[in-house]
Amino acid sequence: MIPKVSKIIPWIKDNKKFLKKTYKGIERESLRIDIDGNISKKPHPIIFGSPLTHNWITTDFSESLLELITPVSNSKKYTINFLNDLHIFIIKNLINENLWPMSMPCKINNDSSIIIAQYGNSKLGRTKTIYRNGLKNRYGAKMQIISGVHYNFSFHKDFWKKYNNFYKIQDKFSSIGYFNLIRNYYRFGWIIPYFFGASPIAHSSFFKGLNTDLIFKKNKFGDIYLPFSTSLRLSEIGYINKVQKKIKLKFNNIEEYVDIVKKAMKTPYLNYKKIELKNNEKNLQINVNLLQKENELYSHVRPKRSLNKNKYKLEDLIYKGIEYIEIRSLDVNPFSPIGIKINQIYFLDIFLIWCILIESPKINDEELRSINENWNRVILYGRNPKIKLINFFKKKEKKLSEILKFILNDLQILVESLAFKKNNKIYQKIFFDLHKMTDNPNKTLSGKLLEESIEYGVERLGLDMSKSHKINIENKKLKVINYQSLIKEAEKSIKEQIVLEKNET
């Protein structure tokens, strides 16, 4: 039986102003491509500042893999407008380049075309590059340039006072509450790739040298896909790898989480020992352990704290508390010029509020297996109308469409209880669209993208979309940041990197 919010509707209505006060931030990744649709071989443009110290514009694995970061805000519109402004600045300053609009990469002629991100000569900068060398040697460079959108989310401290009082929780740092949310996200978060997964297909070059037991199909252009997949990015050919399945996170409490992750960071792994640490004075990885560092842990959601001058200890989660959670299961929305639409933010917020309010029992080994199986089914076969998920609490399986309708109906009850008067029409439209996607899986993002990719091919469709998005972005005006502020931030970041390097000599 899926928990419902109906049991605590009176409390929700009494505390709606605290529930509505949530904070968010977005991290959007996107590959720079040349005019022919190849991955860019140019270094990170200097006009964007230093990727090591810039607050909003950085790089992920590759020099060509941009990461755009919005500051924390309690406003959905501000967040989406800030992300939009960053894209305007990027697009206006790319020379003979564009942004690839999909999660799965553009065509990759060979791995040597993927240049690992560089961060200068400071100890911090060198460590970041060595870490990426390790990722390349462990998982392959192609997997590391799969793009995603990370959604950062938190509640105001006033909410936690009300929440802890209601549930009689003694918790100075709100870790118990955040882990209640995280467990329910693991139980039901597969709803995100069902509706918003957008990587059912990839260019054939991605699959060269890839070993998998999955049975794929090809379109007439040679692109490779799974007919009912929602998100190959989240599958075994993406970020869910067999090695990390050894790390069994249940998110039952903060101490257990930190202990498991620390153990993985200290446990040598035979295959990584074979890679070694150095070859001809080139650092191949930070260490030979299951995880080089916490960031290497590929999970659907993470408890997080903000970096303080690029310093962070895993134990800070215990002694200083969780500041926010990072949702990592969002594919890039290829139909949006900025990789995400505001209706997705509305849904994410209400879904995460629902996750904190419904019952959240501890996860045991048996339920963990069911949870992982449910995610796998939705990721690989989610648009199959016959697909069923495991209802762990009832010890039986139920059709995915029935579970989706149950959750959507409960979310609508929650929205009504929170009385979003200004946004009532927005939520009505969102739920109308989501119910349509439930009844007809082909209307999901993955369904629409697969249909167009089969007709036009990934390469042509991606190029056409990137050109269309560029035109859309170029003609917009900045709304929340002015152009000069972006230039100043870039200049400031370069100076900060220089100071960092000088202080180490």
UniProtKB/Swiss-Prot annotation:
InterPro entries: Gln_synth/guanido_kin_cat_dom (IPR014746), Glu_cys_ligase (IPR007370), Glut_cys_ligase (IPR006334). Its EC number is 6.3.2.2. Keywords: ATP-binding, Glutathione biosynthesis, Ligase, Nucleotide-binding. It catalyses: L-cysteine + L-glutamate + ATP = gamma-L-glutamyl-L-cysteine + ADP + phosphate + H(+). One of its GO terms (molecular function) is ATP binding. GO terms for cellular component: cytosol. The keyword Nucleotide-binding applies. This is Glutamate--cysteine ligase. It comes from Wigglesworthia glossinidia brevipalpis. The gene is gshA.
